[in-house]
Regions:
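Bacterial N-terminal signal peptides
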Residues: 1-7
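The feature captures the LRR N-terminal capping module
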Residues: 7-44, 237-249
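LRR N-terminal entry segment and analogous cap-like coil->beta motifs
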Residues: 21-74, 83, 88, 92
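Inter-repeat linker/turn residues at the boundaries of leucine-rich repeats
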Residues: 26, 50-53, 77-80, 104-107, ...
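Conserved hydrophobic beta-strand positions in leucine-rich repeat
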Residues: 29-33, 58-60, 82-87, 109-114, ...
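Consensus "Asn ladder" position of solenoid repeat domains
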Residues: 36, 63, 90, 114-117, ...
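Leucine-rich solenoid repeat scaffolds
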Residues: 202, 206-249
């Protein structure tokens, strides 16, 4: 996905409050600051703005706010009504995810998009144990640093029961991670699971495809993995029933 980025100097020159007024929707429920590269300092200023209290959807893709910026936002009482938060490409790291997870205000999120943020296994335990995500339906963690260990942490979580979409594309989930998901009974509402490009072989793919633990599943994406005939056969058997779409190429 490509965004038009303003230079750092230009973004900093514009007062953040002016940017907000220009980019907030007419009904003041959606704020789109995509690609402005506002950085940690302006993220802190943003967090202090009372005008955010009506915002339900916040787009902050490509702003390099880092852990310092998201910590300020996570501590802002003005974001208590937020339901949709997109943080693609912000260099949040594990400290950033931990700040989101521990926020006393970000408890109403329905979608949380954290792709390409250098998130590793280290912070996933905080995510998995948090009671803040009772309403979360969409969780995007693609393009991060998640290994089989981290995948198992997510798979074993009992606090993500409402998820309908889980995206772990382009991590290092591997066979052990795929098997952990196949054994999980904690995703009764999951409709879409994306595990493409995760170094998964037939050993992990087949039990996941054959798992009976995803009653609502509609799409299982295993594309761009190291898959052979056993996976193709398992996918064919499921695909012909036309209830679940298995992508494996």
């Amino acid at each position: 996905m490509a965004f038009l980025f303003l230079s750092t100097a230009a973004a900093q020159a514009a007062d953040i409050s002016e940017l907000v007024e220009k980019r907030i929707s007419a009904d003041r429920t959606t704020l789109d600051l995509t690609g402005l590269n506002i950085g940690p300092q302006d993220a802190k200023k943003l967090a202090a703005m009372e005008s955010l209290s009506s915002v339900i959807t916040l787009h902050l893709q490509g702003n390099r706010i880092k852990a310092r910026g998201i910590k300020a936002l996570a501590r802002s009482p003005h974001l208590v009504n937020l339901k949709h938060l997109d943080l693609w490409g912000n260099l949040l790291g594990d400290r950033g995810l931990k700040a989101i997870v521990e926020s006393p205000y970000l408890k109403n999120l329905v979608s949380l998009k954290l792709w390409k943020n250098e998130i590793s296994d280290d912070s996933l335990e905080f995510l998995a144990k948090s009671r803040n995500f009772a309403n979360l339906k969409v969780l995007m963690l693609n393009d991060n640093l998640i290994t089989p260990f981290g995948a198992a942490i997510i798979a074993e979580s009992e606090n993500l029961l409402q998820l309908t979409t889980l995206n772990l594309f382009r991590n290092e989930v591997g066979d052990d991670g795929a098997i952990a998901f196949s054994k999980s009974a904690h995703f009764p509402s999951l409709e879409s699971l994306f595990l493409g490009e995760n170094s998964i072989t037939d050993k992990g793919a087949v039990p996941l495809i054959e798992s009976q633990n995803f009653p609502a599943l509609k799409t299982l994406d295993l594309g761009k993995n190291l898959l052979g005939e056993p996976t193709a056969l398992a996918a064919f058997k499921i695909n012909r029933k036309e209830k679940v779409r298995i992508i494996y190429r």
